[in-house]
Regions:
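A short SAM/SAH-binding and catalytic strip from SAM-dependent methyltransferases
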Residues: 133-147, 151-152, 166
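Residue-level signal for inorganic ion chemistry
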Residues: 27, 83, 164, 206
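Helix-to-beta-strand junctions that scaffold the AdoMet/dcAdoMet cofactor pocket
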Residues: 87, 154-156
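Active-site capping/gating segments
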Residues: 167-209
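Conserved beta-strand signature within the Rossmann-like core of class I S-adenosyl-L-methionine
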Residues: 157-167
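Class I SAM-dependent transferase core
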Residues: 1-66, 70, 100-117
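Conserved SAM/SAH cofactor-binding pocket of Class I
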Residues: 54-137, 147
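Conserved beta-strand segments of alpha/beta enzyme cores
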Residues: 91, 116-118, 159, 183-188
Length: 209
């Protein structure tokens, strides 16, 4: 698996590799009890879940790394758990409204000893007193709704990183028709291609005014 990541300039340390393998094992086992993912093949897991989660942070030019992240609708831990594993210096808040999935995230947190992770079992719009540098979301809801949820949680000039499929332009067009556009400084798209013809991805970066 290391060769896949090396091609993108990403180095997996032995410790990180072990934790990623352990994460995969936990996910596959718990997936038998609750619906976490349809992806069970190990190569697909590493490409469509792990690589997909971290690529925006390695392939976006002039990116200033955040000190804190809030992940909306973390589900099975993508991208939240993955970002916490790759960047242990960043504090990561995982929000998940479904109890069974939140308990899964707690299990992963404790098993992998992720001291930089906090799991909150609630809807993101109900969470109070949490301000972060970056809000992320992957396969949760439309862009306009995500921005509406994210803005109150961001520090001044904080950013949003929303993982989308290649056909995201209509969502951006709809977002620009709303009043929320007046609250953001800029929108940038980072496009990347997953190996083994596993798809095109777009990360929508949005900066708060």
């Amino acid at each position: 698996m290391k060769d896949i990541f090396n091609k993108f300039g990403i180095t997996l340390s032995p410790e990180l590799s072990l934790k990623l393998d352990k994460f995969y094992s936990i996910l596959i086992e718990e997936n038998k009890k609750i619906n976490l993912t349809r992806i069970v093949d190990k190569t697909e897991f590493y490409v469509k879940h792990i690589l997909d989660s971290v690529l925006p942070f390695f392939q976006t030019k002039d990116l200033v790394m955040p000190k804190s992240i809030l992940d909306i609708g973390s589900g099975a831990g993508f991208p939240g758990i993955v970002l916490a594993l790759f960047f242990p210096e960043i504090q990561v808040i995982l929000t998940e409204s479904i109890g069974k999935k939140a308990r899964f995230l707690e299990l992963v947190k404790h098993t992998l000893e992720l001291k930089n992770v906090e799991v909150i079992n609630d809807r993101v719009e109900k969470i109070q007193n949490k301000q972060v540098d970056l809000v992320t979301a992957r396969a949760v809801t439309d862009l306009t709704t995500l921005v509406r949820y994210a803005l109150p949680k961001l520090n001044k000039h904080g950013k949003m990183c929303f993982y989308k499929a290649a056909k995201v332009v209509p969502e951006i067009t709809e977002f620009k028709k709303t009043k929320l556009i007046n609250l953001v400084k800029e929108i940038k798209l980072a496009n990347f291609t997953l190996p083994f013809e596993m798809g095109e991805r777009v990360c929508v970066w949005i900066e708060k005014k």
